[in-house]
């Protein structure tokens, strides 16, 4: 009798264990939390957003400042940010983030309400309306001007405005003749001004100015070391989906534009479709982009060490996939 009771008890325990094991196995993983900016920085994620809402919680923000504290406190697992913010976050988090990939190269352009500017040299004696003082737009503009023999605020006057929308409005109204604008603001301004020209691609000018030793890199993606260490396979799967999403956007601009408008990354599909070709949306792994990033960060550091957090990031800053 005792033997039979023992067998029944063991069977019951095994059944209970199986139920608990089954419950554990079926429990869904917590969504990976991602932050992105509206505009080109977030455009490459749109297909991933559309197809994988069950795996990723992706929130769009208007300003990088809204993202910084969330990364520092660990409230989010990853973020698409301006490139110079990545090493700043590396310092702020005490090296608890890694740069996984570059998301956008240059999206900056000189636009003119007219046709007097054909080259950087033609900017001498002119006034440029711009936004982004203290950030990559300022450092990029100053670097390119200096490399072409022009001294900012001496040979070329720069009027710094609060945001890109203000610069766009000034050019559209005729208040400003020349502006420094990123996509999609180039496209939206062009829609308002029939005579608007886009004579200078700052990405090309950066390459010329640096002798090809670095690249104008505007956006990067970072992830916390916590999510990398605890869910590396999921991180790698996310990055694969991210790369596929970028490929989709570049190869299917019309369909991607509809999704970009649907998810609120840009206000309209028409603007998105026109902006995609000039937005330089890419997925370049940290390993493949390392040399270009180091060259870019060196230029920023030489201009103002605070622009990258004071010091050049070390080797551990770059995610290798290992």
Regions from the PLM with identified roles:
Residues 1-31:
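Short, low-complexity disordered leader/linker segments with a strong preference
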Residues 27-153, 158-160, 177, 183, ...:
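Short, glycine-/small- and polar/acidic-enriched structural segments
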Residues 43-50, 65, 69, 73, ...:
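Solvent-exposed, polar/charged alpha-helical surfaces in well-ordered, non-transmembrane soluble domains
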Residues 47-48, 108-118, 215-233, 285:
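A bilobed periplasmic-binding-protein/Venus flytrap-type ligand-binding module shared by bacterial periplasmic
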Residues 84-85, 165-259:
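Pocket-lining segment of extracytoplasmic ligand-binding domains
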Residues 152-156, 264-275, 307-314:
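Short, surface-exposed acidic
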Residues 228-303:
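Secondary-structure end/capping motifs
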Residues 294-322:
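Conserved C-terminal helix/tail region of periplasmic/extracytoplasmic solute-binding proteins
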């Amino acid at each position: 009798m005792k033997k039979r009771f023992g067998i029944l008890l063991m069977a019951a325990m095994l059944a209970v264990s199986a139920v608990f094991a089954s419950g554990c196995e079926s429990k869904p993983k917590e969504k990976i939390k991602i932050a992105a900016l509206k505009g080109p920085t977030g455009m490459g994620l749109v297909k991933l957003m559309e197809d994988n809402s069950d795996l990723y919680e992706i929130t769009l923000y208007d300003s990088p400042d809204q993202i910084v504290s969330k990364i520092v406190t660990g409230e989010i697992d990853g973020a698409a940010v301006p490139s110079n913010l990545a090493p700043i976050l590396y310092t702020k988090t005490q090296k608890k983030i890694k740069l996984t990939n570059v998301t956008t190269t240059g999206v900056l352009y000189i636009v003119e309400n007219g046709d007097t500017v054909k080259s950087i040299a033609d900017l001498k004696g002119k006034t440029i309306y711009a936004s982004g003082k203290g950030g990559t737009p300022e450092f990029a503009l100053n670097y390119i001007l200096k490399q072409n023999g022009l001294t900012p605020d001496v040979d070329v006057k720069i009027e710094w405005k609060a945001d890109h929308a203000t610069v766009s409005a000034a050019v559209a109204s005729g208040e400003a003749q020349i502006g420094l604008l990123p996509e999609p603001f180039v496209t939206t301004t062009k829609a308002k001004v029939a005579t608007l020209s886009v004579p200078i691609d700052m990405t090309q000018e950066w390459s010329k100015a640096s002798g090809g030793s670095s690249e104008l890199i505007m956006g990067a993606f970072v992830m916390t070391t916590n999510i990398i260490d605890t869910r590396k396979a999921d991180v790698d799967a996310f990055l694969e989906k991210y790369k596929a999403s970028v490929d989709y956007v570049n190869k299917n601009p019309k369909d991607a534009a509809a999704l970009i408008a649907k998810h609120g990354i840009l206000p309209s599909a028409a603007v998105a479709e026109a902006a995609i070709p000039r937005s330089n949306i890419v997925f370049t792994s940290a390993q493949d982009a390392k040399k270009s990033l180091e060259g870019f960060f060196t230029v920023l550091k030489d201009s103002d060490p605070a622009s990258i957090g004071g010091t050049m990031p070390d080797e551990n800053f770059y995610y290798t996939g290992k």
